Amino acid sequence: MEQSRQNLQSQFFIEHILQILPHRYPMLLVDRIIELQANQKIVAYKNITFNEDVFNGHFPNKPIFPGVLIVEGMAQSGGFLAFTSLWGFDPEIAKTKIVYFMTIDKVKFRIPVTPGDRLEYHLEVLKHKGMIWQVGGTAQVDGKVVAEAELKAMIAERE
């Protein structure tokens, strides 16, 4: 197991993400992971398109991607980081685990996210003990911070 974490690849495509995260359409909010350093940090992104169902109501004639979904995307990225830091890329173990949100702190929304944006999640491990992980970071578009947050989650057995 230690060997798999040391040799963990740094980029993951959607077919890999689907093997680790339990989320599915319309709630999977990570398209690709472009950097991952076990126990340290992750950079991932979601491409925001006008075809997102959420834009039917948020808001007609002024589409803005909801802040709560930005935070959820950050949480999913953090969950991927926590899982792969503990078990490497292991789809069989992923079938037996689930990551639960525990707290959201220091959330700030700075700039609206709109169709055509590439929403990047930049998260670092703040601390972890056993199955409890705390991550913090930003969501960015074109290098500008659009949101920031600290998140705490717990990895548990799936029932």
UniProtKB/Swiss-Prot annotation:
EC number: 4.2.1.59
GO cellular component terms attached to this protein's record: cytoplasm; membrane
Alphabetical list of InterPro entries matching this protein: FabA_FabZ, FabZ, HotDog_dom_sf
Keyword Cytoplasm: yes
Location(s), subcellular: Cytoplasm
Top-level class of the enzyme under EC nomenclature: lyase
CDD domains: FabZ
Catalytic activity: a (3R)-hydroxyacyl-[ACP] = a (2E)-enoyl-[ACP] + H2O
Single GO MF descriptor: (3R)-hydroxyacyl-[acyl-carrier-protein] dehydratase activity
Gene Ontology terms: biological process: fatty acid biosynthetic process; lipid A biosynthetic process
Keywords per UniProt: Cytoplasm, Lipid A biosynthesis, Lipid biosynthesis, Lipid metabolism, Lyase
Superkingdom to which the source organism belongs: Bacteria
UniProt keyword Lyase, yes or no: yes
Main location: cytoplasm
PANTHER family given in the database record: 3-HYDROXYACYL-[ACYL-CARRIER-PROTEIN] DEHYDRATASE
Family: Belongs to the thioester dehydratase family. FabZ subfamily.
NCBIfam families: fabZ (TIGR01750), PRK00006.1 (NF000582)
Protein name: 3-hydroxyacyl-[acyl-carrier-protein] dehydratase FabZ
